[in-house]
Amino acid sequence: ADMLMKTSQLLRYGLDNQKRISSLRNEIEMIGKYIEIQKKRLGKRVRFILEYGDGQEQISNISMPGMILQPLVENALQHGLHDVTENGEVVISVQQQDNVITISVSDNGKGMKPQDLEELILNDYQMKGGTHLGLYNVIRRLEMYFHDQIQISLHSDEGCGFEVFMEIRQNIQ
């Protein structure tokens, strides 16, 4: 019953927020539910780590497009950790220092060859055959919303996982 409740909450959030504005706090709450569902599905094959601040400082609850974290975690599972039978790991980290919030989603999966990563970036985050559309949509929506306040970088090496790293600078009045 608990999994059914989490699944329905996640679906409702996705339907309500895919084209709307949400908040960082809502994104964190929903990725927590998504992780619980994936833990049941994957068992001990993949470990999830959610790092949210250092416990000392409150992270600003900034407005942001909805459904940002879930597609990135889904990409990690589908592309990086698809064949993993044990010791897979997905780390979602949200930190803040002064007026800069950093968000990263990384995995320890198969990664990408440097030339494939370069091709992904040069082709506007889309691969031939239409793969990585979730990554494309997330990056486009973030760039449209935050404009020059956000920097997004991708890091990967074959056999060494994949990371999407975002740095959001808040305007302080």
Model regions and ranges:
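C-terminal beta-strand of the catalytic ATP-binding
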Residues: 166-172
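Two-component histidine phosphotransfer core
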Residues: 1-153, 162-165
